[in-house]
Amino acid sequence: RETWFLHSVNMYICLLIILTGLLVVVIVGIFRYEKRVWLRRNPKHSRLLLPSWNEGSKNMGVAISRVDDINYGRHVSFSWFDGRFITAGRHRVAFEYYEYYFMARRYNRKIIYKKEMVFNFKADTVYVIEVLQERQTFRITADTNNYL
């Protein structure tokens, strides 16, 4: 009787692990599909690498709040893990330099400063966004080491 109980518990644990794995695969698959669709619709695009780093219990980084007066640049850009893909051409982009305390009980992302910049993004080019904290601005440079 005890072995039957242990066998059924082990079976449920294995089933739970398998279902969790399938859920992760489905979520990753959806993200990859959405990326592929966006890249197919926007063949002339650039990539922006947005820096992010930890300082103790806080995360510092750069985010995009608007692209061409569109919140988060929906349809004009596509967010990916270490940055964004953006359609080639001239865009007005609002960058934010922020700090985020990940040990806090509630979400408290503090924007240190914002800067709106107009830039002409060339197709098939990777751009690195650098923080110039002393001047409270950003520098956009083409990265020759990374490729799309």
Which residue stretches match the model-derived regions?
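Short loop/turn and low-complexity linker motifs enriched in small/turn-promoting residues
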Residues: 1-148
